[in-house]
A protein has these predicted regions:
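Catalytic core of non-heme Fe(II) oxygenases with the double-stranded beta-helix
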Residues: 1-96
Length: 96
């Protein structure tokens, strides 16, 4: 997820099964206020990105990467999703 515009209140990407980092430097990138939301919520900062893999090499989902886009309370958020389709053992087809 790439944040193209994040001039907003709210609108983060929440991973409820991740543990909050303990180092204060992370507060530039994640919501550190205790608002009752479980897990880690990445702030929608323009020019920043979050990468995660949804599946392991066997195609099983990672429970830790269950996530949700939180509501934008005010302002504008524009994000760009980039899906990676690499699978272990994949052999690309012939070049065109």
């Amino acid at each position: 997820m790439v944040y193209l515009q994040g001039d907003c209140e709210g609108g983060g990407t929440n991973f409820p099964r991740l543990s909050m980092p303990k180092e204060a430097k992370w507060c530039d990138y994640v919501e550190c206020a205790d608002d009752g939301t479980e897990g880690v919520t990445f702030k929608p900062r323009a020019g920043s990105a979050v990468f995660w893999m949804n599946f392991d090499a066997e195609g099983k989902g990672y429970r830790e990467t269950i996530h949700a886009g939180m509501p934008v309370l005010s302002g504008t958020k524009i994000g760009l999703n980039i899906w990676s389709w690499y699978q272990a053992g994949h052999k690309p087809g012939a070049s065109v």
